[in-house]
A protein has these predicted regions:
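Bacterial Sec-dependent N-terminal signal peptides
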Residues: 1-3, 20-55
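Terminal, contiguous helix-loop blocks that mediate binding/assembly
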Residues: 199-459
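N-terminal carbohydrate-binding/catalytic regions of secreted carbohydrate-active enzymes
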Residues: 71-110
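Functional beta-strand-loop-alpha-helix junction segments that form "active/interaction loops"
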Residues: 128-163
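Loop/turn elements at helix/coil->beta-strand transitions in domains of secreted/extracellular proteins
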Residues: 56-59, 91-98, 165-171, 253-258, ...
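Solvent-exposed loop/turn segments at secondary-structure junctions
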Residues: 66-70, 104-108, 146, 176-182, ...
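Bacterial N-terminal signal peptides that target proteins for export
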Residues: 2-13, 285
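Surface-exposed loop and adjacent secondary-structure segments within mature catalytic domains
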Residues: 103-139, 173-234
Length: 459
């Protein structure tokens, strides 16, 4: 077991932060100024110059939004596991960078959490020190009332990372509850959802009594991770915050090489298409994610180095569940190339138009689903088109477009079979909304998504 050395901001700074609402950040302990490790490039003078185009290192950020119900224990364990894996040696400009943004409730004891007061999120850097130590270097401490499930906070963290750690490439793992493309508040209370346009970037606040129904992910069965969900209970009411998919995408200030979601139900074509232009590869699950999530002990071995390999993370994720039994053998995952989505959109637009009537009359029980209970907003993209009546040549064209953008996909034969789960007989690598089993108010929101604008699934 590696030992952990924590370098934190001074006590005086911490005390000042406790009485202020201003974020406290420090510049990274790196040498030199300007850019990362670069090769000398001949200039017009006798002295060699350096250029930012020759950056060598990669940056990995784990954004762990854990001030929520059910999963703080697992998110804390994920970070602990991350510290046992391979880490860069030191903090020089030549070294890769591992950053962790974590926001957990206050820990009472063991795995008991206090939601009645706010707790400060922290951004820190992990690296290997001397004698096998793991150094946790605190970079930023944010105000206790910070909402991590907000586009504003996500943008602030990513902007800091981009500015302070110039690099060849950037990647992010997002770990929290999530509900795919669905608008804020819809997943847990679809019957009361009414679509209303809201200002971009504003997280949704829901205030209710403490005896509100449990979120879907807290119902019977193994604990699951279900974009961002902050939960506070400061008094005789409950306050929850969620982030909109469109705002999430807009908050990313630079193009990421990869974005991996350790969160439920994010594996939809709607999510991938909304992130087109924001990341090269996206890895996600079409169904829920059991709370243990990714294999954080091996994660850095795939994502650091000259050529990050996010597919390795997806492969490890699937394999760790596929060897189990019963409910625990439950996983869906795919890795998608977001730069290759246009051919799929073109084929789907044509087929959606041709088979619109039959798609709008599809019977839910005949199409591969990825949901439990009554959360019927996630079906298999390919299976919908097949059940709508597409012929063999059309399905071949659809499969060709899928093969072009889906780099990797895997699914267990069943998903939570003893907890209202389902069999997996068809797996295209994408889930999708099925209007035939949809919701009028959800249709209104769905029309605002880039996937619908490109394909007119919902007219």
């Amino acid at each position: 077991m590696k030992r952990v050395l924590s370098i934190a901001i001074s006590r005086a700074a911490a005390a000042l932060l406790a009485v202020s609402a201003v974020v406290s950040c420090m510049k990274p302990f790196e040498y030199g100024d300007g850019f990362g490790f670069i090769d000398p490039v001949e200039g017009t003078s006798d002295r060699p110059v350096r250029t930012p185009t020759d950056l060598k290192r990669n940056v990995l950020l784990l954004y762990s939004a854990g001030h929520t119900t059910g999963i703080p224990k697992y998110l804390k364990e994920d970070i602990d596991d991350l510290k046992t894996g391979w880490l860069p040696d030191g903090v020089g400009f030549s070294n890769d960078v591992v950053l962790v943004y974590t926001h957990l409730p206050k820990n009472v004891s063991g795995y008991s959490w206090d939601y009645s007061s706010y707790n400060s999120p922290v951004l820190y850097r992990l690296y290997a020190g001397e004698d096998g130590t793991v150094v946790s270097d605190t970079l930023c401490v944010y105000p206790p009332e910070t909402v991590s499930a907000s586009a504003q906070q996500l943008n602030e963290v990513l902007s800091y990372v981009h500015e302070m750690f110039p690099a060849k490439g950037y990647g992010m793992i997002f770990s929290s509850h999530a509900s795919g493309y669905l608008p804020n508040t819809f997943y847990n209370d679809p019957g009361n959802y009414i679509y209303m346009e809201s200002p971009a970037g504003r997280q949704t606040l829901s205030v209710s009594r403490p005896d509100v129904p449990q979120p879907v992910w807290m119902r019977e069965g193994p604990m699951v991770k279900s974009l961002g969900y902050d939960y506070f209970r400061p008094g005789d009411y409950v306050a929850t915050y969620e982030m909109d998919l469109k705002d999430f995408a807009a908050a990313i200030p630079m193009k990421l090489d990869y974005l991996l979601f350790d969160a439920c139900l994010m594996g939809g074509i709607e999510v991938a298409y909304e992130l087109k232009g924001k990341c090269g590869k996206v890895g996600f699950s079409q169904a829920e994610v059991l709370a243990e999530g990714f294999d954080y002990k091996t994660l850095t071995s795939h994502l650091l180095g000259e050529n990050p390999y996010p597919q390795g993370v997806c492969e490890d994720y699937f394999q760790q569940y596929d060897i189990l039994y019963g409910n625990e053998r439950s996983a869906t995952v795919s890795l998608v190339d977001c730069d290759q989505l246009e051919p799929l959109a073109a084929v789907c637009r044509e087929l959606f138009a041709k088979y619109r009537n039959s798609m709008n009359a599809l019977r839910a029980g005949r199409v591969q689903r990825y949901y439990r209970y009554d959360c019927h907003w996630f079906y298999d993209l390919y299976d919908m088109v097949a059940e709508a009546g597409a012929d063999s040549s059309e399905l071949a064209r659809l499969q060709e477009a899928l093969d072009l953008c889906v780099d990797y996909k895997a699914a267990t034969p069943e998903f939570l079979p003893y907890s209202y789960g389902f069999s997996i007989d068809v797996f295209s690598g994408f889930s999708m909304y099925m209007p035939a089993d949809g919701n009028v108010e959800l249709d209104k929101y769905y029309r605002t998504l880039q996937w619908n604008k490109a394909t007119l699934l919902v007219e």
